[in-house]
Amino acid sequence: MEAASAALRRCLLLIVLVAAATLLPGAKALQCFCHLCTKDNFTCETDGLCFVSVTETTDKVIHNSMCIAEIDLIPRDRPFVCAPSSKTGAVTYCCNQDHCNKIELPTTGPFSEKQSAGLGPVELAAVIAGPVCFVCIALMLMVYICHNRTVIHHRVPNEEDPSLDRPFISEGTTLKDLIYDMTTSGSGSGLPLLVQRTIARTIVLQESIGKGRFGEVWRGKWRGEEVAVKIFSSREERSWFREAEIYQTVMLRHENILGFIAADNKDNGTWTQLWLVSDYHEHGSLFDYLNRYTVTVEGMIKLALSTASGLAHLHMEIVGTQGKPAIAHRDLKSKNILVKKNGTCCIADLGLAVRHDSATDTIDIAPNHRVGTKRYMAPEVLDDSINMKHFESFKRADIYAMGLVFWEIARRCSIGGIHEDYQLPYYDLVPSDPSVEEMRKVVCEQKLRPNIPNRWQSCEALRVMAKIMRECWYANGAARLTALRIKKTLSQLSQQEGIKM
């Protein structure tokens, strides 16, 4: 695309130069015959026109030849000075070639009308419009040719065309096969770029299923398999690159982390789209799921345990040649968690995540103090007391947010037909789109937390969930549970309830 753009710019520059050469007058002055210029060999120079006239009186004929400056040509398309005069009986003629006025004019009107009409509006318009039309046609032709070449080179298939990926991906290969080969080959950092691009460029988009902070999410198909395609606008290239980079972290793949498939930049001939292809989960986000359905005790434990497992894997550092750095999510909420067909969760939207290098005790990007969703921000983020140099601080902020997600899940747990309506955390304390200051006042100054209904005390599973929540919400981040501890507690609860994950 860059090569095509450069070629187009060169073509346009050439056309402009040709047009300028065609339309701009030459630097040399026009030389005219001048009957009064005896000292200059009867020649004058002008930037306007040459003029000649003949006036017939009762006793003689007066001839006049001279230069007319451009400033005196009023109006420019049909100057008054060049028009014949019926009152004086003068016949006039203006022209724009050297010594073109050194002619004999008849004293009759027909010649003057014919000659002066040479600078009439129709002819003048034709002279000007000719080169302009040529330039426009050449320009449109050039744009059309370059556009067609670009579309052919970067075509987006409107129907599935397996022949496009046959050289790289054998017939009958599924996404599951590709991912399995990748995870068992030892790399663990995502599919090869060529395979990613091949997959992305043979996906057929089906329907838009949502919009987020950085773009739109579509359901697509590749070889009959459904995939999710997150499309970023070109101005969000940094966000797209960052999320793709995090997803391809070595050893990140986990059943409770959204399965990454491919990243590609696609040019549709008009603008560039940045694609992030992942597994498709028809239930959508946990936020959507809880709005639509209530859950059983078993369903609640599966949702909570799988979320904790995903976060524990993110937070965990795996040491070794194929190790994985510890990662903090920084924007954990029910809208960034997806529900799978089997009723478990996977964590998505890693665009704001940060990775920790334990060898140097550094974070891989300069973190912003306040990123993420205000409603889910931990107290230390809201009051700006978080220690940005200490990676554990980011993990503890994730734990606080997960406690709020657990509260959303537990409210929808139906026991004996009794359950609460779905609500966002702090729904009764702040507006629908709260500011940082409004959240800080409630969470830090008033030290309020989401209300835990009394009915939860009548169920062991809900009692355990409530205890975990409270230990996630401590104002002191160091006192909060770790993701691994929460995972173990919920695993014990699932065993007690006889739940198979």
Curated annotation (Swiss-Prot):
It catalyses: L-threonyl-[receptor-protein] + ATP = O-phospho-L-threonyl-[receptor-protein] + ADP + H(+); L-seryl-[receptor-protein] + ATP = O-phospho-L-seryl-[receptor-protein] + ADP + H(+). It is found in: Cell membrane; Cell junction, Tight junction; Membrane raft; Cell surface. Pfam families: Activin_recp, Pkinase, TGF_beta_GS. Disulfide bonds join 32-50, 34-37, 44-67, 82-94, 95-100. The active site is at 331 (proton acceptor). GO terms for cellular component: activin receptor complex; apical plasma membrane; basolateral plasma membrane; bicellular tight junction; caveola; cell surface; endosome; membrane raft. Urogenital ridge, testis, ovary, brain and lungs. A motif (FKBP1A-binding) lies at residues 191-192. The chain crosses the membrane at residues 125-145. The modification Phosphoserine is found at residues 163, 185, 187, 189. Keywords: Apoptosis, ATP-binding, Cell junction, Cell membrane, Differentiation, Disulfide bond, Glycoprotein, Growth regulation, Isopeptide bond, Kinase, Magnesium, Manganese, Membrane, Metal-binding, Nucleotide-binding, Phosphoprotein, Receptor, Serine/threonine-protein kinase, Signal, Tight junction, Transferase, Transmembrane, Transmembrane helix, Ubl conjugation. Residues 1-29 form the signal peptide. There is a cross-link at residue 389 (Glycyl lysine isopeptide (Lys-Gly) (interchain with G-Cter in SUMO)). One of its GO terms (biological process) is cell motility. Residues 30-124 are extracellular. Kept in an inactive conformation by FKBP1A preventing receptor activation in absence of ligand. CD109 is another inhibitor of the receptor. Residues 173-202 form the GS domain. Glycans are attached at residue 41. SUPFAM superfamilies: Protein kinase-like (PK-like), Snake toxin-like. Its main location: membrane. Gene3D superfamilies: CD59 (2.10.60.10), Phosphorylase Kinase, domain 1 (3.30.200.20), Transferase(Phosphotransferase) domain 1 (1.10.510.10). Its EC number is 2.7.11.30. Belongs to the protein kinase superfamily. TKL Ser/Thr protein kinase family. TGFB receptor subfamily. Transmembrane serine/threonine kinase forming with the TGF-beta type II serine/threonine kinase receptor, TGFBR2, the non-promiscuous receptor for the TGF-beta cytokines TGFB1, TGFB2 and TGFB3. Transduces the TGFB1, TGFB2 and TGFB3 signal from the cell surface to the cytoplasm and is thus regulating a plethora of physiological and pathological processes including cell cycle arrest in epithelial and hematopoietic cells, control of mesenchymal cell proliferation and differentiation, wound healing, extracellular matrix production, immunosuppression and carcinogenesis. Homodimer; in the endoplasmic reticulum but also at the cell membrane. Heterohexamer; TGFB1, TGFB2 and TGFB3 homodimeric ligands assemble a functional receptor composed of two TGFBR1 and TGFBR2 heterodimers to form a ligand-receptor heterohexamer. The respective affinity of TGBRB1 and TGFBR2 for the ligands may modulate the kinetics of assembly of the receptor and may explain the different biological activities of TGFB1, TGFB2 and TGFB3. This is TGF-beta receptor type-1. It comes from Rattus norvegicus (Rat).
